[in-house]
């Protein structure tokens, strides 16, 4: 009887140890996945000196007047650093960063739509579509937003498809 209790006690400890190892493995897996997602975002997002959107304040676009951010008000979201013009915009971004983060990693939406290519943007050439910020290249007479506006639905579908392929 005593040896039966010892045997059952060992089995229980073995099962507990296996459960512990499984949980530990899952935790490491989740952490590794999160790091991989951040690394992918850093590789694929449009940043200069580690800062997105050419240092423009993502929240300011939604008030209709994009302004440059200040390094004093910054936030790192999933590996991407954003600057904000003031503390209020910083706090607003923190509440719902996915709302304010630009589409297609902050690259020119028109070019992502055409062929998945990533080119820099002019931070004051933008359009908010379905509540999402889209940025565009614009220099001299080459304004990609004007081209986008000619066939927005088709281009948006192409940009979504190309961006998803790049991120996965």
Language model features with spans:
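N-terminal secretory signal peptides that target proteins for export/translocation
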Residues: 1-16
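N-terminal cationic amphipathic segment used for targeting or macromolecule association
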Residues: 13, 29-34, 157
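Charged, low-complexity intrinsically disordered segments
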Residues: 35-168
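Bacterial N-terminal signal peptides
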Residues: 20-29
